[in-house]
């Protein structure tokens, strides 16, 4: 790897699977894509350990980007309905998990655990940042276990409208 080449650990966290790979700045993959089942029940600590395990299994990266479902503000989890359940999507929210996740600073926790700069955003926002042209209004809708949505204007993420 050239000294000026910056690799990013990219993790897409879904309700059923956690998908990951290492990318360079142009989006070229420097690892085979990885996919593991999302473990449940999934506390913030278990999530962090799972992401650490993913990181350790892939080539070294300079930084990380983690997209996860739910409302995320500046890397802090406001709500992540899939992960607040004991058995996964479309099951009853567990009050104890809800309390653990609500207000959890995932960006700071992952930055410390991975020992690299880490950005944590809503998964639709991460997806959109990778595909928008930067011209005018652009809407990104993602369909997976859940439905994701993001609006960009002039290449910048617009205020949240959940």
Please name every model-derived segment:
Residues 44-49, 62-63, 72-131:
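Glycine-rich phosphate-binding loop and adjoining helix at the ATP-binding site
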Residues 2-76:
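Conserved phosphate-binding loops in N-terminal lobes of ATP-dependent enzymes
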Residues 13-14, 68-69, 122-124, 143-145:
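Fold-independent oxyanion-binding glycine-rich loops
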Residues 3-9, 21-25, 31-32, 41-46, ...:
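Glycine/GP-enriched mid-protein hinge/lid loop-to-helix segment characteristic of carbohydrate kinases
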